[in-house]
Amino acid sequence: FENLFLSIFPIAISLLFFFLAKSEKKRGSSKNERVLLIAGNGVELLLLCFIILDMSKSISQAMNESTLVKGLSMLMGLVFCFMAFLLPQAERNSVFGIRTRWSLSDDLVWAESQKKSSFVFAISGLLLVIFSYVLKGFFCVVCIFAVSILACAIVTIITYAVWRKNKK
């Protein structure tokens, strides 16, 4: 049953991103369509990497838990770097990007928030890749969560600060 779910879930996610991209195209935003299609392919690739890691663990018991955590940390870091690349390209929308009430309030705030947030995600991604090499086991998992939560908090503060600056 697990293998069936692992096969169907990435297909469902791909279809979701495909239909979201097509809805953006109907709204007249071909730039957001392209960003969503690229993001969908990135998520698909990430899910396939998780499936490969799971299969390799099932096939070979030589892979220990620490190796799996390192691989997941590295993948998370790469996803953050990938997001950093895509964020500045997205126009204001309700699907993809740093979407807070402040960033959605104005196109100028949106663009500046995405640009500044991309640096936060790039640094967070690099930290996660470095942590995957340096740290082991449970401490690596704690650092994954800490970096992710800290990045989200910083990005939220950035969008508020940009909104406040442009409000004046």
What are these regions (language model features)?
Residues 1-11, 65-83, 146-147:
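Alpha-helical transmembrane segments
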Residues 6, 14-18, 36-46, 111-123:
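Select subsegments of transmembrane alpha-helices in polytopic membrane proteins
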Residues 11-25, 82-98, 159-165:
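Membrane-water interface of transmembrane alpha-helices
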Residues 16-28, 48-61, 131:
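Membrane-helix exit/interface motif
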Residues 27-28, 91-113:
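Cytosolic, membrane-interface loops and tails of multi-pass inner-membrane proteins
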Residues 33-72:
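Long, highly hydrophobic alpha-helical transmembrane signal-anchor segments
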Residues 80, 123-131:
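Hydrophobic, membrane-inserted alpha-helices
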Residues 130-145:
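Extracellular/periplasmic helix-loop-helix junctions in multi-pass membrane proteins
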